[in-house]
Amino acid sequence: MYNTDVVIIGAGPVGLFAVFQAGMLGMKCHVIDAQEVIGGQCITLYPEKPIYDIPAYPKIAAEELIKQLELQAAPFNPIYHLNQQAIELNKQDDFFEIKTSKNTLIKGKVIIIAAGAGSFGPNKPPLANIEDFESKSVFYFINDKSKFAGKNIVIAGGGDSAVDWAIFLSDIANKIYLVHRRDKFTAAPESVRQLRHIAETDKIELVTGYQLNALDGNNAELQSVIVKDLHNNTRKLDANILLPFFGLKQDLGSLANWGLNVKHHHIEVDSSYYQTNIEGIYAIGDIAHYGGKLKLILTGFAEAASSLHHAYSRVFDGKALHFEYSTTKYGEKK
């Protein structure tokens, strides 16, 4: 049995920043994550993807962001319980007891749920025999962009992942086809602007009004992707690689059975301190839902700070928190 102040579920960027914030407030942390390494989707799905909206970083790779967040949290000696899920929750007086899938027991006064999309997997397009090409010609996640150098690539989707990867890979690919069933893209406006600028060259071709229809190839080697419009007109795109980006399937797993208010696979919280309907349990980052929610990493950072400042009196038995700036606090911790 471990005893701690705060149990953080999720070791993605928001969970890691929560470790730092808790440490600055004098709180000890244990962190639970289902993956074998810390970093969440940033490491598992897109370590090389550039992130542009982190303050003070004009551009930073997801993997590097996680490295910096881990370094920032390290002085506070968090204990990580990786490759295991939080499966059971029991309330005991002023404490919560969590049991993991490896039978680890952790007792804490506050729980911060920063589980991102929960357990995640790709939404796969309904194409015949697509599994024959997976991991060789069809990829749902990118962890090594160099394998796509000089390739003809079909990217399918209209959101941030599809648009961002089309831009990012355009420097190394021979040709990119971006297939989307609509004329408008739902990615960030600046990303769409960059996309359309590059599309004026031969590096990216926008194939709008079409959807994926079939794959053609042999021995897991893709030769072409067949797309179809609303009038059943087809077009063959010569391609070696297919990257379908249709979002993730979300699964809260055991968290859905903890008595929390859940809506559309997200945990509902108040918009002031991000506390759930159970006092002492907070949800932050992509897993949290409230009016006006923005699914951004930097928003999750702010939610981590607010929730832990609010949790201070619970952790320290009603003691009032006297606010100090980090320059003062960090000097005391050294």
Swiss-Prot record:
Q: Which SUPFAM superfamilies match?
A: FAD/NAD(P)-binding domain
Q: What is its EC number?
A: 1.18.1.2
Gene3D superfamilies cross-referenced by the UniProt entry: FAD/NAD(P)-binding domain (3.50.50.60)
Please write the reaction equations for the catalytic activity of this protein: 2 reduced [2Fe-2S]-[ferredoxin] + NADP(+) + H(+) = 2 oxidized [2Fe-2S]-[ferredoxin] + NADPH
Q: Which residues bind FAD?
A: D33, Q41, Y46, A86, F120, D286, T327
- What highest taxon heads this organism's lineage? Bacteria
Name what cofactor the protein needs.
Answer: FAD
Cofactor, free-text remark:
Binds 1 FAD per subunit.
A single GO molecular-function term is: ferredoxin-NADP+ reductase activity
The record's annotation in InterPro entries points to: FAD/NAD-bd_sf, FAD/NAD-binding_dom, Fd--NADP_Rdtase_type_2, Ferredoxin-NADP_redctase_2
| Keywords, sorted A to Z | FAD, Flavoprotein, NADP, Oxidoreductase
* Oxidoreductase in keyword set: yes
Family the UniProt entry places it in: Belongs to the ferredoxin--NADP reductase type 2 family.
Its quaternary organisation is:
Homodimer.
Please give the name of this protein. Ferredoxin--NADP reductase
